[in-house]
Amino acid sequence: SPMPVLAATSPTDCFECAYMASKIALEHMTPVVLLTDAFVANGSAAWKLPDLNDYPAINPPYVTPDMAGNWTPYQRNEETGARYWATPGTEGFMHRLGGLEKDCITSAISTDPANHQKMTDMRQAKIDYIANEIPELEILGNPEADLLVVGWGGTYGHLYSAVESMNAIGKKVAMVHFNYINPMPKNTEEILRRSVSYTHLRAHETLS
């Protein structure tokens, strides 16, 4: 099933990514995968406890009293595709919960192939919309680079150091690094299409 995927770049970035993963999960009513790795787990850094007032507010799509009577469990926001959240015990919004796939409107268990495809398409559209709310990619390093290095997650520090070292000896190297893997930032295609002007495009998943 389509779902958002984030990757933390460093120990200090873990809080930021966890907060944003929670914001996406609660506002868009979707599971979120947050990736870390050995570089992040075994690293350390000084980190100041942040002021949560400096972070964007989390606004779940709760049901409202005026929706009672016409509400269905899988009713969605037309713009975002997110389902409305009726917390257990809310008067007028009784519904069933479970892990099996449900009818796209009623929440009754469904094994109908057409309903399954429709639900998958709706989930994908919901995930695609999230790209409107995440930051765009930033190109680091030499803006006139011959080589673009692409990385994600805990490889950030190693790749950035390598890019800086290469530029220091006269090589022309740039870098983009992904925190948001699904959906990708909206300018991803634009940046990677520029690779036609790069002599080389190199993606790194691990370091060796």
Pin down the residues of each PLM region.
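Conserved thiamine diphosphate
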Residues: 1-33, 37, 58-69
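Generic beta-strand/beta-sheet core signal
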Residues: 8, 33-37, 150-153, 176-178, ...
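Short acidic, glycine/serine/threonine-rich loops at helix termini
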Residues: 16-19, 43-49, 160-161
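Conformationally flexible catalytic loops at phosphate/diphosphate-handling active centers
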Residues: 32-138
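C-terminal substrate/ligand-recognition segments
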Residues: 148-159, 166
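Generic long, charged, amphipathic alpha-helical segments
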Residues: 159-191
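Single conserved hydrophobic/aromatic residue that forms the stacking wall/gate
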Residues: 203-208
